[in-house]
C-alpha cells in the first residue's frame, strides 16, 4: 500500500487530498459542499474528487471523515441534522467501495480530528484524550488507549448535548453562543460581528465582550470538569476557530477549572490547544483507515 485519498466532508466545504503511509499530506484542496443539495449529491461530488485524485496517483484506499453520526463498522450515516438534508442512512463505505473497488473506512469528523491530534498533534504521546471542538456548536470525541470510544449506539462523545447550568453546553459555550450574546447586549445583528471581533474587543477592554468571554470560559470549564471526573483523560484538547486564541482562553479556563476540580485531579489534568488546524480531519481519517485495515 502506498497512497491514500483522504476526504473530510463538512457542512461548508469538503477538504481532500493525498496522504502517504507516513501520514504526510502530499497535496490538499477543497471545494464547496453545497450541503443544501443533500447527502447523495455530496457523495457524487466525493466520487468526482476521488476520480480526479486517481488520475495522477496510485490510490490504495479511501479514508473518509464526515459530519453526522457514523456507524464506523458499516461506514453508514446513522444521523445527520438539517444542515445536510437526506444524509441520514447514506451508506458511504458501500457506495465508494463499489465505485472504486478499493477499501474504504468512514468515521465522524470530530472523531477524525481527535485522532489527528492524538497521533500527530496536541495529544501525541498520550494514552487518553478528550477533544472538544468549539465552533457553531461543540463537538466532542473521547480516545482511550489510541481508540475512539464510540459507546453502545455510537453516540459517545456527543458532548455538545451535555447539560451545564440547565442548558446544553453548546448553547452557552460555543462560538455562535458567544457572538449571539454579545450582539444581543450591544443591540446589533449577530451576522454583523464574529468571534474575532469579540476577542479583539475583549483584549481592548470592552466590558461586554470581557464579561461574555469570561462566561463562556467558565461554562466550558464546568463541562470539562464533568468529562475529567468521568473518564480522567491524560489531556483535554481544545480546537475550533476561537480556540486559536490560546492566550485568551488558557488562563480563563484553567482558573475556572481550579474551582470545579479537587486539587489532586486539577494537578493531573492537562489542557492543550489543537495544533493541526484544517488538516486534522484528513490526517485522522487516514489514522482511522490504518487502524481498521490492519485489524
UniProtKB/Swiss-Prot annotation:
Family matches, as Pfam families: ROK
Superkingdom to which the source organism belongs: Bacteria
Family of the protein in this entry: Belongs to the ROK (NagC/XylR) family.
Protein's name in the database: Uncharacterized protein CPE0188
Amino acid at each position: 500500500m502506498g497512497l491514500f485519498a483522504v476526504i473530510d466532508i463538512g457542512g461548508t466545504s469538503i477538504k481532500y487530498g493525498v496522504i502517504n503511509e507516513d501520514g504526510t499530506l502530499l497535496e490538499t484542496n477543497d471545494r464547496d459542499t453545497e450541503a443544501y443539495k443533500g447527502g447523495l449529491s455530496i457523495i457524487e461530488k466525493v466520487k468526482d474528487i476521488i476520480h480526479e485524485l486517481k488520475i495522477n496517483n496510485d490510490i490504495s484506499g479511501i479514508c473518509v471523515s464526515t459530519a453526522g453520526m457514523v456507524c464506523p463498522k458499516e461506514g453508514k450515516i446513522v444521523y445527520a441534522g438539517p444542515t445536510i438534508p437526506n444524509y441520514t442512512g447514506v451508506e458511504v463505505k458501500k457506495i465508494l467501495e463499489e465505485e472504486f473497488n478499493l477499501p474504504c473506512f468512514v468515521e465522524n469528523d470530530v472523531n477524525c480530528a481527535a485522532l489527528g491530534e492524538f497521533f500527530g498533534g496536541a495529544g501525541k504521546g498520550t494514552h487518553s484524550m478528550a477533544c472538544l471542538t468549539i465552533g457553531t456548536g461543540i463537538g466532542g470525541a473521547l480516545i482511550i488507549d489510541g481508540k475512539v470510544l464510540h459507546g453502545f449506539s455510537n453516540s459517545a462523545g456527543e458532548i455538545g448535548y451535555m447539560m451545564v447550568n440547565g442548558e446544553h453546553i453548546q448553547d452557552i459555550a460555543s462560538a455562535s453562543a458567544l457572538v449571539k450574546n454579545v450582539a444581543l447586549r450591544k443591540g446589533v445583528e449577530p451576522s454583523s460581528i464574529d468571534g474575532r471581533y469579540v476577542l479583539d474587543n475583549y483584549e481592548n477592554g470592552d466590558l461586554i465582550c470581557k464579561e461574555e468571554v469570561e462566561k463562556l470560559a467558565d461554562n466550558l470549564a464546568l463541562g470539562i470538569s464533568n468529562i475529567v471526573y468521568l473518564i480522567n483523560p491524560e489531556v483535554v484538547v481544545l480546537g475550533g476557530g476561537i480556540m486559536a486564541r490560546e492566550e485568551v482562553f488558557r488562563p480563563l479556563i484553567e482558573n475556572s477549572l481550579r474551582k470545579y476540580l479537587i486539587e489532586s485531579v486539577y494537578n493531573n489534568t492537562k489542557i492543550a490547544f489543537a495544533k493541526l488546524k484544517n488538516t486534522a480531519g484528513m490526517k485522522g481519517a487516514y489514522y482511522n483507515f490504518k487502524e481498521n485495515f490492519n485489524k
